[in-house]
Amino acid sequence: MSESKKMPAKKKTTRRNTKKEQQKKAATRKMIAFFVGLLLILFALARLGIVGVLLYNIVRLFVGSLAIVFLLLLAGLMIISVFRKQVLKENKRIIPAIILTFIGLMFVFQIRLHQGFNETFHLIWSDLMAGRVIHFVGSGVIGALITEPAKALFSVIGVYIIAAVLWLVAIYLMIPGLFPKMREDLHQRLAKWKEKHAEKVEAKKAAKALAELEKKQAVAEREELPEAAENSLFTSAPTEIPINIPEAPFEENETESPVLAEVPLDDEPVNFSNTNNYNGNYKLPTIDLLAEVPVKNQSGERENVRKNIGILEETFKSFGIGANVESAVVGPSITKYEIKLATGTKVSRVVNLSDDLALALAAKDIRIEAPIPGKSLVGVEIPNAEVAMVGFREMWEAGKTNPSKLLEIPLGKSLDGGIRTFDLTRMPHLLVAGSTGSGKSVAVNGIITSILMKALPSQVKFLMVDPKMVELSVYNDIPHLLIPVVTNPRKASRALQKVVDQMEERYELFSRYGVRNIAGYNEKVQRYNAESDEKMLELPLIVVIVDELADLMMVASKEVEDAIIRLGQKARAAGIHMILATQRPSVDVISGLIKANVPSRIAFAVSSGTDSRTILDTNGAEKLLGRGDMLFKPIDENHPIRLQGAFLSDDDVESVVTFIKDQSEAQYDESFDPGEVDESQVGTGASNTGSGDPLFEEARNMVIMAQKASTAQLQRALKVGFNRASDLMNELEAQGIVGPAKGTTPRKVLVSPDGEFIGGVEE
């Protein structure tokens, strides 16, 4: 019995000891698990050995490149749960706030990756199998699973908004009193603003009431005055009328224009051009005639820009070039990335990487501007995914050209969105070249339309040469034309020579009146007309437009080149300006002499760097995209400027031309008429020589009747170029009609007017 009584006592003691031991064992296991977990986290964070890299990649599989953040948060929560458990019990919102913040980060990291679920898993799995950590993998498999549906439903911007909302909610959970405090501050500021606004309104009401009171007092005092005083008040009232004149400045022009219109009628014996007759009723074309081109939203390019910045920096780094993208400017057709190079990097190394950068960016073509003028940066111009068309109406409205500058023309939109204009009077001549379909003809039509929308027919005249017969024929019969559009290349050289003769006549006129240019002459005419009853007409500006220079150079190269060179050298002061366009920019068309006298150039897309150097003296045009993409090199710039030309449809041109034709008829100037040209007169680029020249008999008779002979005399009388006149003179000498040349004196004529041979040639 004693043994049976002792046994239960031993069992009770054993049960009591087992509970304590279990608690100790549980605490021990918990601490062991804590330290083992913390040790594994440290191995994973430091990527120590194969185990550390493996653990880190396993975490990356689920949360991607946020593995470091996840492991640090996990370690922090473990430490708090073991040593500061009370903190989590008192602040139950901390864990939900951390989870929301982490989910927002997962959205952002996965969007930055620009990859889907399969690509993300492949990148992580390749690193896991290779035992390395190389690629940026977004937010892992979990991030891809939650981001891809959100991106499909709400777009990229929507995902960013969701992430921002999650972060705001997390901030609210962690700092509950923050938003109420902000709301109170906002209410206080609104209350202060309302008080100030109410005070201003009350002050205005008080001032208005005071003004009405003073007005009533003035009326009461006026009623008490005698009639004489009342009459005196009414007589002085008209002195306030001139104050309103500056508010309507256009009324002055409307009153002056009929006077200008009546000038030729008062002075009928003077047989001047009648261009001023319709200036009084002539109205300039309005912007409403042009169609609006919808403005394209380019916000979608931002994502491409961010992606390209990373590719550019990585590509430069792979070639051993230290470079950082300072800024990116999105233009209508291209985006320009401004890149800062590391000190000591040669610019030539960057220029030579053009093809490699195009390959990395998967771009059609890129242009490198090294360096950017005025900056210590290199520009890399990359085509946009979609081109934003620039409308001519939009450019005209934004350009805001000076109405007094008749030849100031909006040309195109620059990279920063600004409108670039140029004044043809300062150029003073312009060469436009580019391959077929590059936008050359649209640019020429834009220049002509810009002038037509600003200038009266008496202010600007055109002489147009269009051997293709389809580009400029739409402008026939407008009152701004000197003669109908010249389509025969054989007549074009004569028409250009007529312009040269007009230039010489203007210089003789300037010399007679003691002025230096057309502006001084017209100013003198204005003063004379203001002081005298007899009226003189101002000289108009003349714009010569040749749409296809190559065709003219094939038919009569010497005569055309001579006329262009003479106009290029002297025509600016005479108010004559040229626009030469060609789609074949070769050296036999754009010769060195033509380039020297036409300093301002526009290059559209060409096929080779050789053509680009022919136009601009530098490479670059071969990298253009076409459809209005141009390089503009004015006379006052050393480097070409890239612009996107405006689109002007044929319907818009037709609308403007029809509006002008409906107002007045064309009145051509016969002095510019090239006349009829015999097909046998002009060879293939060189002047005719020998007795087969049809003008030989006319030259022979003219020399015999005048009894003096010189090449300049033949040029003026026969309206031919210098080479042809020289050949005629040599033939006259060979047939014994004139003597040999003796310096600058005219040659002696050896045949009398009666046909007798005089002879007497001095040795």
UniProtKB/Swiss-Prot annotation:
Residues 7-18 have a biased composition (Basic residues). Residues 681-691 have a biased composition (Polar residues). Pfam families: FtsK_alpha, FtsK_gamma, FtsK_SpoIIIE. Residues 176-763 are cytoplasmic. Residues 416-613 form the FtsK domain. Its main location: membrane. GO terms for biological process: cell division; chromosome segregation. It is a multi-pass membrane protein. Gene3D superfamilies: 3.30.980.40, P-loop containing nucleotide triphosphate hydrolases, Winged helix-like DNA-binding domain superfamily/Winged helix DNA-binding domain. Residues 668-679 have a biased composition (Acidic residues). GO terms for molecular function: ATP binding; ATP hydrolysis activity; DNA binding. Essential cell division protein that coordinates cell division and chromosome segregation. The N-terminus is involved in assembly of the cell-division machinery. The C-terminus functions as a DNA motor that moves dsDNA in an ATP-dependent manner towards the difSL recombination site, which is located within the replication terminus region. Required for activation of the XerS recombinase, allowing activation of chromosome unlinking by recombination. PANTHER family: DNA TRANSLOCASE FTSK, SPORULATION PROTEIN RELATED. This is DNA translocase FtsK. It comes from Lactococcus lactis subsp. lactis (strain IL1403) (Streptococcus lactis).
